[in-house]
Amino acid sequence: MRSIVTGGAGFIGSHFVDRLVSRGDDVLVLDNLSSGKAEFLAHHTSNVTLVNVDITDFDAMSPHFEGVDIVYHFAANPDIRLGTQITDTDLKQGTIATYNVVESMRIHNVPTIMFASSSVVYGDNAPMPTPENHGPSLPISLYGASKSAGESLVSSWVGTFGLQGYIFRFANIIGDRGTHGVIFDFIHKLKRNPSELEVLGDGRQEKSYMEVGD
């Protein structure tokens, strides 16, 4: 099986590369290393090729889809706050990048995509636990809007061009190689000052997490 993993040098993507290699896939990682790290893949001595390419550049990235069996699309802007400061960040790195992926798949006859979406597509008012068919999705961040748009692009390429697509709405992933997030910040604050613990709100908030290996 020849697989592409976009964003495969990132936190979640690199763990997915590990899993694909363990089952014998030949993996092509497309990553511009803006947030991903080549060292996350350095332990692979075979079956992994890292291509430093920006998937917002259609002409540069599209030829790599020739002869591929499946695409795992993880690449996106990992910094939600950045999107509020430079407001076209998620449009380019999320929506347009996802268009480039599915259109490259159409051109090169790649049959299957796994799209890494996010629970942020639901917005603030979703019931907990959230049923998969809850809707409409009302994202309240630009990142969430780009993920929602990405889901729609995948769905429309499935309906129009016969692509096979799977969408996963990840939430609060933690584990080795993580570079940011609530738990990451919490642990590093305690490491810097073990005698002081900052408590937000009343301290009774609850949040579910998933370990990246799961």
Where are these regions (language model features)?
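N-terminal Rossmann-like NAD(P)+-binding domain of SDR-like oxidoreductases, especially those catalyzing
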Residues: 1-173
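NAD(P)-dependent short-chain dehydrogenase/reductase
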Residues: 127-128, 155-214
